[in-house]
């Protein structure tokens, strides 16, 4: 029973880890266009997210390596990313949006690698666990796309 519970937790972690990525990534450009951002501004926003994830990945990797509470750190990073994600709803001003988006990715981006490390350290079957991430991503793309089609792009962040 212990192994089954451990597997379920790892599978659920990856499913829900990749759901937000699947919900947001395919539609973010269209959403930003719908709130009035130019193509250049859309490119800046999305590239700042990536740059933030890369830069802060170094910091969070060091913190992760030096902490005993690895799961708590990951949970705190999830929470912070979620808060910043909600804050993106509060603005349509480019500079404010790009700042909040970069802050969100400072927490969200590095979580993927840290979770990979946690799963491998636990001795889980990484490819099996990772496949649940692909399932979560795919499910979120379908659900979010359907929701956006029915309710408009401006509604995608409420998911």
Task: Please name every model-derived segment.
Residues 15, 84-114:
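Hydrophobic core of transmembrane alpha-helices in multi-pass small-molecule transporters
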Residues 28, 106-123:
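Intracellular juxtamembrane helix-capping segments at the cytosolic ends
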Residues 25-26, 134-146:
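Glycine/proline-centered helix-kink
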Residues 50-58, 137-138, 142:
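Residue-level signature of mid-helix packing/kink "hotspots" within the transmembrane helices
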Residues 146-159:
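A membrane-interface helix-boundary motif in multi-pass transporters
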Residues 72-86:
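Structural signature of the two symmetry-related core transmembrane helices
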């Amino acid at each position: 029973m212990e192994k089954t519970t451990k597997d379920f937790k790892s599978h659920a972690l990856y499913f829900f880890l990749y759901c937000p990525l699947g919900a947001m990534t395919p539609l973010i450009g269209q959403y930003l266009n719908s709130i009035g951002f130019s193509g250049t501004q859309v490119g800046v926003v999305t590239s700042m997210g990536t740059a933030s994830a890369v830069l802060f990945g170094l910091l969070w990797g060091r913190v992760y390596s030096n902490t005993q509470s690895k799961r708590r750190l990951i949970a705190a990073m999830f929470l912070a990313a979620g808060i910043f994600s909600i804050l993106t709803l509060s603005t349509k001003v480019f500079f404010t949006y790009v700042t909040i988006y970069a802050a969100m990715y400072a927490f969200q981006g590095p979580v993927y690698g840290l979770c990979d490390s946690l799963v491998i350290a636990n001795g889980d079957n990484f490819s099996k666990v990772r496949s649940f991430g692909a399932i979560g991503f795919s499910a979120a793309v379908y659900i979010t796309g359907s929701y956006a089609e029915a309710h408009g792009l401006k509604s995608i962040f409420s998911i």
